A protein has these predicted regions:
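A short, Lys/Arg-enriched amphipathic alpha-helix followed by its capping loop at the start of a domain
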Residues: 63-73
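Asp-based, Mg2+/Mn2+-dependent phosphohydrolase catalytic module
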Residues: 69, 76-78, 82-83, 87-193
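N-terminal helical cap/lid subdomain that shapes the substrate entry/recognition surface
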Residues: 1-65, 84-87
């Protein structure tokens, strides 16, 4: 994103971090802020920022694969990226077969996670009217907080999970949290879905 903003848009490098933070706070994503304030072409932006050698960053995780294969749930990807990038990521991780649909930034346009409108669109696409029957896993606390406020069973995953946070502990930001994929089935069994 920094390269796009500097090279394609001519924004001075020293202004980029401040603008990214401002747009993220005000619009939910840097992209939505760039759309609102700079009339950026969404497809050009997405193509540029997603042109990455995923194999250098992402590697299949056998535990993640095993857990996802064991889930009796209908799984969707809900992302602020576009569907082609999400598919590339799923293929790289070798987990594409475990997801039935992708709700991407284009399908929720002009909204994005973590807005209520985006959650409602995703819920409609999932074919569910009751958010309490759905769980959402995300790696950002502000997204899990919004998901929980919307009525979803919100699960925080990854490096944002505080080390002292037990899997069953409650927080205003989430209903549950995990760092190890093998913990996910137990968390889903504890959900109200």
């Amino acid at each position: 994103m920094n390269s796009y903003m500097g090279e394609r848009m001519g924004i001075p490098r020293d202004e980029i971090p401040r603008l990214r933070e401002k747009y993220f706070r005000e619009y939910g994503t840097t992209l939505r802020g760039l759309q609102a304030k700079h009339n950026v072409d969404v497809q050009d932006f997405l193509a540029y920022v997603h042109d990455l050698p995923l194999q250098d960053y992402l590697h299949p995780d056998p535990i993640q694969q095993k857990v996802l294969a064991s889930l009796p749930t209908r799984n969707l990807i809900f992302t602020n990226a576009d569907a082609p990038h999400a598919r590339r990521v799923l293929r790289q991780l070798q987990i594409e077969e475990y997801f039935v649909d992708i709700v991407d930034v284009n399908r929720v346009d002009p909204h994005c996670k973590p807005s209520r409108e985006a959650f409602q669109i995703a819920l409609n696409i999932a074919g569910e009217s009751d958010p309490s029957k759905c769980a959402m896993t995300d790696d950002l606390p502000h997204t899990t907080r919004a998901a929980k406020d919307f009525g979803l069973y919100a699960i925080l995953y990854g490096s944002a999970v505080p080390s002292h946070f037990g899997a069953a502990a409650l927080s205003p930001d989430m209903d549950a949290a995990f760092n190890d994929w093998s913990q996910l089935p137990a968390l889903l069994n504890g959900s109200h879905s």
